[in-house]
Amino acid sequence: MAPASSHRGHQWICDLVRGSCLLLLLVVSNLLLCQGVEDYAPYCKNQPGNCRIPLQSLFERATLVASNNYRLAREMFNEFNKQFGEGKNFTSKVINSCHTEFMTTPNNKEAAANTEDEALLRLVISLLHSWDEPLHQAVTELLHRNGASPDILARAKEIEDKTKVLLEGVEMIQKRVHPGEKKNEPYPVWSEKSSLTADDEDVRQTAFYRMFHCLHRDSSKISTYINLLKCRFTPC
């Protein structure tokens, strides 16, 4: 019987293949893994046990998902602003109001590059956790409200699904490179549900604008941090 960590790793890659548009070479390699073909030599950096998924493969898939989430978040934010932002002063209402605003994160890429990899991994995991509830509520509300375009709903649903996949993958990476790491940063609780479900259209639209603005910002951070980590542990 395959080890549980190996099975979870293969399942994560299978989920990613089914939901992401990857380069042909990665698709082929992933499909082989999904079909049970284990042609990789054992490769578990700093982790005991019989694992056959190379660390580089985990990082490649994580960077692809993070980059895709960032693209989707940017497109969703722009689409929402185009559809609902005309004549609205949304920007002034959402400055410094993200629920992740008070997380201590590097101010720029240079600062992130000088941050220890243990801290970056904890930040990525905490940021991903902090978006569990907001994304779930956004998808639920978009499903039951008229007005939002199908494209916005589709992107929100894909980001929700892929954020779960990405979180599992990053947690696997953390266990691989820092097997003794047990502490993660506390993640902020989102408290905007009442605004997101408000009957007042202006309140509701402002809440969605704030969410999509903050998601765009945090998705950029997550993608940047994972790319930096990839270059520390595998060839860039």
Curated annotation (Swiss-Prot):
Keyword Nucleotide-binding: no
Segments forming a coiled coil: none
Signal peptide: 1-36
Disulfide bond positions: C98-C214, C231-C236
One of the GO BP terms on file: positive regulation of receptor signaling pathway via JAK-STAT
Glycosylated position list: N89
Localisation: Secreted
PROSITE patterns reported in the protein's UniProt record: SOMATOTROPIN_1, SOMATOTROPIN_2
Family matches, as InterPro entries: 4_helix_cytokine-like_core, Somatotropin/Prolactin, Somatotropin_CS
Superkingdom, natural source: Eukaryota
One of the record's GO cellular component terms: extracellular space
Pfam families associated with the record: Hormone_1
PANTHER family to which the protein is assigned, alphabetical: PROLACTIN, SOMATOTROPIN,PROLACTIN
Family: Belongs to the somatotropin/prolactin family.
Protein's recorded name: Chorionic somatomammotropin hormone 1
Species of origin: Bos taurus
